[in-house]
Amino acid sequence: MDLRTGYMFPCLTDGQFVEDDTLHSVALGIDSPISLSNGPDGEWARELSIAWAILLFTYNEQEAVEFACLRNQHWFCVDAKMNRDLSWKDIEIHEGGTSDGRQVNTGLCLSQEGATPIPTRLQLVLVGSISGGGLSLEYRPNLLSAEQAANVASTLETIMRALQGRTVSIGSIDVLSERNITDLNRFAVARRALPEGCLDDIITAQAVERGNSIAIDSWDGTLSYQELDTLSTLLAKYLRSLDLSGTYVPLCADKSAWAVVAMLAILKAGAACSPLDPSHPRSRLQSMVQLCDAKAVIATERHASLLQMDGVEVVVVGPDMSSFLQHQISPAEAPGPSHRDVAFLMWTSGSTGAPKGVILEHTALFMSISAYAAANQFSAETRCFQFTSFTFAVSLCDIFGTLSQGGCLCMPSETQRLTDLTGALRELHATFCWLTSTSLADLNPHDLPDLRSVTVGGESLSRELVARWATHLRLTVSYGTTETAGWCLLNTGLSPTGDARTLGRPTIPGVWIAHPDNVNRLVPVGAVGELLVEGPFLAQGYLDDEERTAAHFIPPPSWMTQFRPQEVTRLYRTNDLVRYNSDGSVSFVGRRQAHAKIRGNRISLPEIEAQVRHSCKDAQAVVELVTTKDQVEMLTAFLVVSGQESLSEAPLICPPNDCFRETVTNSLSVLEQSLPSYMVPTVFVPLSHIPLTRTNKADRHVLRKLAEAMSRADLVQLMTKPRPVEQLPLSPLERQIQGLWADLTNIPAESIGPDDNFFHLGGDSVLAIHLVPLARRHGLSLTVQDVFRYPKMKELGAHLEQEASQGSQRSKSQPIASFDPTPWKSVAAQQCGIDELAIEDVYPCTALQEGLMALSAQRTGAYILSMAQNLSPTVDLGRLLEAWQTVVKAVPILRTRIVRLTNEGFHQAVVDESIEWQSVKSEAEFRRMNQLNPLGLGTRLVRFALLLSAADQPSRLLLAMHHSVFDRWSGPLLVRAVEDAYQGQPVMPQYFKDFVSYVSTCPREEVDAFWRHQLSDADPTVFPPTPEPNYLPSPTKSSERIILLPLSRTHVTITTKLRLCWALVLSQHTGNADVVFGAVSTGRSARVEGIESLIGPTLATVPFRVRIDGSAMVSDALQALQDDAATMLPYEQRGLQNIARISRETRAACNFQNLLIVHAPDSRGHSTILKITDDQQLLDLFSYGLTLSCEVLDQDRIQCQAFFDPNMLEHAYVKVLLDQLAHAVRQIHAVPDCKVGEISLLSPQDQQQLQEWNPPIPRTGLTIHETIQRQCLAHPQKEAVCSWDGSITYRALNELSSSLASQILQRCGQPTSFVPLLMERSKWTAVTMLAVMKAGKAFVLLDASFPVERLQSICCQLDATLILSSSKHADVAQRLVSNPLIVDAIIGLPGPSLALPVVHPDATLYAVFTSGSTGRPKAVLISHASYGSGAEAHIPAALITPATRVLQFASYAFDASIIEHLSTFMAGGCVCVLSDPERTSSLAEAVAAQRANFAWLTPSVTRFIDPQDFPTMDRLCLMGESMRRSEIERWSSRVNLMQAYGPAECSVLATLRPSLTTQSDPRNIGCARGCHAWVVDPENHTRLLPIGAVGELIIEGPIVGQGYHGSPEQTQAAFPPVPDWLSDYHDGDLSQVRVYKTGDLVQYSPKLDGSLLFIGRKDRQVKLRGQRLELSEVEYHAYHTLAGTWELVVELINSQHNPALALFLAEKQDSPKPCGVLSMTPAWRSVMSRLRDTLASRLPPYMVPTVWIPITQIPLSSSQKTDRRSLQSLAGDLSAEQYQTYILASSSEATPGLTHSHLKEVPLNENELVLQDLVRQVFTGEDGSLSVASIPMDGLFTDIGGDSLGALALTSLAKQHGFHFTAGDVLGSSLGELASLRHT
């Protein structure tokens, strides 16, 4: 490999883009040193060449310089080897061959006479004349500005003078000219006085001035300046008590307001803060703690365990600051820090493998931050988004710079920062942000209206980003290092055309550019040198490293006195290479030596190299950051491992052996534990030896050039390059196949053996398609299906031999059978509005063409592709337009229009017509033209326009093409055809009719049988769901992700892997193992000669079914999918609309709303002639709710673009889907030998999000009665109970309950744990509950309405010996225990005053009974700590305050009655108790009388009451059952409506959602309160599911109960051991953690706010005919149809062993009645028929009930929930004859002709008669003749099997008869309504 790259003088245009390439001249101010009479070969010419070589070496220090030299009127290339230690006289000038083709742009021209033409490739030439005269520098402005040209000339003059008469080394020449010195004096910034101070003083001052103004707005809360100052002072006092003054205190925290509190506290305590990154390995963090000899560390609770070390105290900081309150009084008030004290210790990469600590003083940071704030225009209005890690020094500038000006610091969470940066910036209304360019590239300025200023640093910024952002806001480029306190250069206010490489000027003195190898020499302006920084804001140095400090912080060189007469103490060497522009600004060039930055992270290559060598044991290693030839930055490790070493003469790169692979695997596992991820090499390159320089150092230049000459794919392949196989005997046929495969895969033929798999070798579907014609040219008859079925060489060879021996003949295209286009030309011409003679041919459309036309008719503009061709001045426009005309003439599909022929369906007419060129002023105008005159039936489907410039000259050629005549595969083919025509090459005719012929010959019966079998019993779930029936998706948003694949070789294609992974994602998100999604095939596998080069729409969309089998091996599942895809190939052209008509199952399968498209890499090359105009045009190509377009960029990268409808999917949710897809793809690549069920879709992003949603939860240390007693003591006279039978104050509640507790203790003759309470609703219930607690017992509320046997069973289970009862129920109590305590008889009487026991918080508080599967109720046990922890969370969430008056409505058998009492008392509120008659007969009056303002109710109860009757009620929380949308609409405008969820086993309430609106999803049960909510596999709770997946909810945390009393087996089943995955989310001991399996199916809300959607019970999924039903949705539509006097329930029932959807309807009753079934009278039938008709017009057929049962009243359970079991029993008790009377209408199949009993069969007028006949014509054809009598005029078109294609056909036919409606009207209106839209 030739590594010589020539020499290119750098572009010095001062950051400006200049096109001028004319020659300009600047004269040199130096005379010829000697006479030129000795000619151009003389000594002077040699000296001039040497001077020129030194100049080139000065500006681009490259050891080998090359330039052109004129000799004998010919330009030759000369080169010279340069070395700084070399004497200039020893430089050897070597003359090479011609300079043509060499990469040189400078030259030396010494001519005899006259001017000599200078080649345009030479941009800088030294010109002299042998005949005498001076020298001049000829330059082109596109290389040098005039100022820089003068600088170069002055430098050359200085060099030439230095050579006169002296023998000096190159390095000793001072090349700094007088002009340069003048410029540097001008550039130097005058010193100015800067403020000195301490950082913590900033906050103290602002706290006084701005007090309650918000200082920090964080994801975890807000802090005012006063709060920030107070909290940090409080913590500082505690830190002083630990004697930390003068020490380093590491801080380990994620983004949080508390991190800033901790920083300030450390500073106020007189210590120095040392931020650590918690994402780094534990070993690295602990080594930093040891290096700084820390006595204490501060961490958030989540990361405290990372820093647990002997002798180091861990201080946990967070919202709970109570631990610090105990230390407010420090031993003595220590003085605050001095401005010369150390403030921060920041860690950066070190060269030895260990990190290095940079010491920053208060004053350095204070000055730097003050200047930073001023330069970025910070003010009190600034809302600064804190993006960078706390370990970056610039984070200090953001934090303290913002706070110093009184602004607001906006703090996102780690998850927001990494996964939803746009959302975080928008939510926090940030006005300023410091970002890396990588992060900026992911944002769109249009999405961030509040953002006014962005500063970019850390890595280079592209021109594209500058252009995108500079027009919208103030864009600044910053530069700085940790050693310079975060920054030292700013380039503010970039223009859209500004140069992002320009770092700007210093605002604090000063910066200098010295020679990288000799800082005692400054470099000329424009030359590359090392940046030196001086000033008061420099760091002290490096922690405990005097040697490194001395090397980087140097004393001022001697040249400093020329520019700084005052004292400069030291400078910092940055190791960064830069150059001056002529205006004094500095431009970045690169990193010096071994330091680099990658993705904004600063790295030390020696550190990484040291770690790699350590991990690789005996291997030699060199690590370099290289940029590949395809411009990909890769951290690359070059390795020589044991067993691969060889002599230096051997090829440098060698094939990897087993030892190399094992070494790399082991190294990666070690590096991932010891280095941050960005410091782990991306690729390892196997070498035979390390190349060396002359000084025996690793020749890194050679290694970099070696890697930079390769692409990313080339480097990656080096790790897995297949080894040559042993030469095995091959048959002649196998040898042919071997050659074909070698040609396609670029793998040497000798490396391909008979057992090799085509797909192992990199084959894919595209290469398989290209293999077919290649094989045909070699005489082999092959199909794409053959390649997939027989992927191994020997298998394919055997198959072809068998085919040949049997004389098999492949089918070829046949003419379209029995179709004469002649009769239809006139009809086609009429529909097209053209002359019949212009019609060349008419033939049928493919199913794809039909479907695309139908879909675009529903959504104007859909499936239209816009393309553009740039017209450069060099293009001959006339010739180009003629080329296009030639192609259109040769390719009939480009002249095709689509029409509909009566009784024959859709056909395509080829029209003999020329291109009609339009002229437009903008692309938007062209789009508007196409919108006003859409591409549709009868119109041109390919349109052309010329875009005119401001001068009315054509600047672009525009095309609009309908996808019914064009597909993606055709794009490069069309480009090639136009290019051929433009170059005068012939364009071969192409006939799409051949493909149509092939499709028409496929036997329809066989095709339909295939799809019927393929989709039999299909049970798919539509994803994403549509917001309403008949909704037409409009994908207007997109999201993108790159998937990086692990290196692997598998036997299947990338497409197959993506399909399996997408199926897994869909399965998780739908909760269905039977998945169907849309898949797109190229259609290029058809047996049509030349199909691979045919321009036309051959692609096909099919329903792709995947049945997930968790027990199958991944490799087997992949192979099965690939086999399915191969089997499907002959049947893929049937068309979705036709497949849907085959059966009910196929129709359901074709109802998918997500489409997967995989574009395999195409090796045919690309052209710049045609390109997609913009992303919006891509959005117009799709009509599904979600389309996933995946493009395989190379063997280890896939670009995934998701196009989606924002009304169906949230943008953040789509990103979750893409993350999970990427995670699944990586897993099946990395571990293909696992089982499908072992693949986890829980992505790292999911894990981070779940961690954030489930933070640590505090556990209460108090009992419930202790908490209530605090309220009693705080508010003794406040009303605690307001009851129908009297009122009780908190003092009375406390005293009465204590007295009663003593009596309980006295009466308990034997130990008892449980005390049942048998009371009617009364004020005494509260007293008894509290008394039982104080007595150390657990209460059990009994419902007195229960049968005595049930009550006896409960008491028996609990071994109860004492019952507290009221007088009313004394008789029943006597039957339960022998000696009950009658409360109202003894309350207030003198009694014993016994010492009450001390109750532990873990003691049982109460037991509540739930129904059990065995018929025996289960007693759930809840402790004080469990309920108290839950109450501390749900009380503030539900807004329960001392002013809250809670209605006590729930039955005592329902645990809601407990929350009504206890949580109210704990908050200091009042419980309002109604009597039973008030509760049932006069609820509104009683609530008003007691002024109740809060209620916990079930949704069923709210359906019986009117919000207007409850004016005092301002808060309502619904719980206990699923909420309907109707409840939200009725109540949300009247009260603060909330929804809660919680099983009895989890302290009543586990989730709560406040403040519902009419836009709220009724399924959303809110976020976890006092617990963690996890979604697990319903069949395996040890498997945590990804975000968005449907799974079982398990609850973990302190609210989880103790289990079931006396039922260990049931307890074990419901409260299982803690799953292993929980340890990933807990830092502490898990022995006390409990989890509860709810049995409820949920999924996280797509809004990704941590809330949950309730799906249903695990054991009763509601599905009917393969469709999941939301019963509440059907109920919602039914309620909206009926007046308010009705009650209804929709339920799935089973009758005659068949499931059916039933609607139970009842009139509202004033008083309870027994529930029973009523007869179906004519009146009932009339009501229900009207209701059914309305539902049928709004809902899909499967959601319309078929069984309609009138009943007396909707039954309720004792807990006031709808009793659905009773309804199912009512239906089940019906006889077969009775059941038939309640079937209002039979369900409709997809087959046309089925009628409903209520349908009107006789049209009323002529319009209806005509329309009825037109409908009949639409259904005449392959489905047979449809009876007119079976076409209902008051029914929907879809009722008789109509679909979108039929709607388009009807629209076309009806238009000819005067009807004016759209395809959308047909799908959404009744036929009678359509008939009225006729204009006669």
Curated annotation (Swiss-Prot):
Entries under PROSITE patterns matching the protein: AMP_BINDING, CARRIER, PHOSPHOPANTETHEINE
GO CC terms of this entry: cytoplasm
Modified residues (O-(pantetheine 4'-phosphoryl)serine): S765
Keyword Transcription: no
UniProt cross-references to InterPro entries, sorted A to Z: AA_adenyl_dom, ACP-like_sf, AMP-bd_C_sf, AMP-binding_CS, AMP-dep_synth/lig_dom, ANL_N_sf, CAT-like_dom_sf, Condensatn
Region (Adenylation 1): 205-594
Residue ranges annotated for the Carrier domain, each copy included: 728-804
Pathway where this protein functions: Mycotoxin biosynthesis
Annotated segments matching region Adenylation 2: 1269-1665
Induction (free text): Expression is positively regulated by the ochratoxin cluster transcription factor otaR1, probably via its binding to the conserved 5'-ACGT-3' bZIP binding motifs found in multiple copies (3 to 4) in the promoters of the OTA biosynthetic genes. Expression is induced by sucrose, glucose and arabinose which repress the gal4 transcription factor, a negative regulator of the ochratoxin gene cluster.
Molecular function per GO: ligase activity; non-ribosomal peptide synthetase activity; phosphopantetheine binding
Domain notes: NRP synthetases are composed of discrete domains (adenylation (A), thiolation (T) or peptidyl carrier protein (PCP) and condensation (C) domains) which when grouped together are referred to as a single module. Each module is responsible for the recognition (via the A domain) and incorporation of a single amino acid into the growing peptide product. Thus, an NRP synthetase is generally composed of one or more modules and can terminate in a thioesterase domain (TE) that releases the newly synthesized peptide from the enzyme.
Family: Belongs to the NRP synthetase family.
Function description: Nonribosomal peptide synthetase; part of the gene cluster that mediates the biosynthesis of ochratoxin A (OTA), a mycotoxin composed of a chlorinated type I polyketide dihydroisocoumarin moiety linked to L-phenylalanine, and demonstrated to have nephrotoxic, immunotoxic, genotoxic, neurotoxic, and teratogenic properties. OtaB is responsible for the linking of phenylalanine to the dihydroisocoumarin ring.
Protein's recorded name: Nonribosomal peptide synthetase otaB
Gene: otaB
